[in-house]
Design a protein with these regions (language model features):
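Hydrophobic alpha-helical segments, especially transmembrane helices
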Residues: 3-4, 76, 246, 250
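Hydrophobic alpha-helical transmembrane segments of integral membrane proteins
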Residues: 4-6, 72, 224
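Secretory targeting and sorting signals
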Residues: 1-28
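Penicillin-recognizing serine hydrolase domain
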Residues: 31-46, 141-277
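Active-site-adjacent loops and short helices of periplasmic peptidoglycan-processing enzymes
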Residues: 26-181, 188-191
Length: 277
């Protein structure tokens, strides 16, 4: 059952799906009118979702199962896949092919050794596409890495997700897809990895030859922010997935196909979500 208002779906009892089979969960009839959430319609994201991290209850959403390109938010899925197969202290040396990529980049130097942890910090904090390429090679090459990422997506319940590049870069014939629902599921699963949760909260990290600074502005703008990942490509437009905690409650927010101030909308979504019973 579903009630919509100008494209807005309030799903006060809906649950995020975490199984790998079966239909998407039904959205229960809300027990309040959607007028309380009308202000959320003014946000710049075409599709979005805010949900309780611990119960999986979707508090509000617009087009939560609409498929969009994820851009760099797919790096959260890559991070989980990496930690399923590689130890944080394992290392490899960068080569020229890792750096031949459209940036954003952390600035890998061919011949320099990097640990798995350093590369995870690079993809989660500064969205390094070069680091994503290197991690894919450490997993056995891009075809192997992408197959592992897509298996991981299915395993955690993100059944509408397909990664076609480890970094989120896209183009004709290699478009990645996901949904707001799936990104919320992926983020919830990722924050169960202590190292991912720690990295996403770091303001800075030491990287060979430099200090890198986390690009997630909500770390400083929103009290209780637990971390987040931005993304942008021409196909995806602006994307964001993040989480925050207030008291004992944790929420996850997803925004897809956006323009303008996604951080401002994320703050409104989180504030509204924390105000709900």
């Amino acid at each position: 059952m579903r009630r919509t208002f100008a494209g807005l779906t309030l799903a006060l009892s809906a649950m995020l799906a975490f199984s790998t089979a079966g239909p998407s969960p039904a959205i229960a009839q809300p027990d309040m009118e959607p007028t309380a959430a009308q202000a959320l319609l003014d946000g710049p994201a075409k599709a979005w979702l805010v949900a309780d991290m611990d119960t999986g209850r979707v508090l509000a959403s617009r087009d939560p199962y609409a498929s969009h390109a994820p851009a760099s938010t797919i790096k959260v899925l890559l991070a989980m896949t990496v930690l399923d197969h590689l130890r944080p202290e394992s290392f490899a040396r960068a080569n020229q092919s890792h750096t031949e990529v459209e940036c954003s980049c952390v600035g890998l130097k061919p011949g320099q050794a990097y640990t798995t942890r350093q590369l995870l910090e690079a993809i989660l904090m500064v969205s390094g596409n070069d680091a994503a390429n290197m991690l894919a090679d450490m997993l056995g090459g891009q075809p192997v890495a992408l197959a592992a990422m897509n298996r991981k997506a299915a395993l955690v319940g993100a059944r509408g997700t397909r990664a076609s590049s480890p970094s989120g870069l896209d183009g004709p014939g290699w478009e990645s897809v996901t949904t707001p629902h799936d990104l919320a599921v992926i983020m919830r699963a990722a924050l169960k990895y202590p190292l991912i949760a720690h990295i996403m909260r770091q303001q800075t990290a030491q990287f060979p030859g430099k200090t890198i600074t986390n690009q997630n502005e909500l770390l400083t703008r929103y009290p209780g922010d637990l971390g987040g990942k931005t993304g942008y490509t021409n196909l995806a437009r602006k994307t964001y997935v993040g989480a925050a905690q207030r008291g004992n409650r944790r929420l996850v927010v997803v925004q897809m196909y956006g323009s303008g101030d996604l951080y401002g909308q994320a703050i409104k979504l989180l504030d509204w979500g924390f105000a709900q019973p």
